[in-house]
Amino acid sequence: MSRVCQVTGKSPITGNNVSHANNKTKRRFLPNLQTHRFWVENEKRFVKLRVSTKGMRIIDKVGIDKVLSDIRARGGKV
């Protein structure tokens, strides 16, 4: 399973660890992904999504129905 948010599309980015001596080594910054079940009232079932915490806030604000329709319009499987 890839580390990509199904709502926002956030994915890992690369950067550097920087030591006290200013030595730099490559690292990855991973998104804060959570697997969460959401109840979809009009389908009378739970939908399991892998979303970032920002994606959860978006679902709280606009609603799960709107988010699911956007995911399906992009061709995502839900």
From Swiss-Prot:
One of its GO terms (cellular component) is cytosolic large ribosomal subunit. Belongs to the bacterial ribosomal protein bL28 family. Keywords: Ribonucleoprotein, Ribosomal protein. The keyword Amino-acid biosynthesis does not apply. GO terms for biological process: translation. GO terms for molecular function: structural constituent of ribosome. It comes from Hahella chejuensis (strain KCTC 2396). Residues 1-21 are annotated as: Disordered. This is Large ribosomal subunit protein bL28.
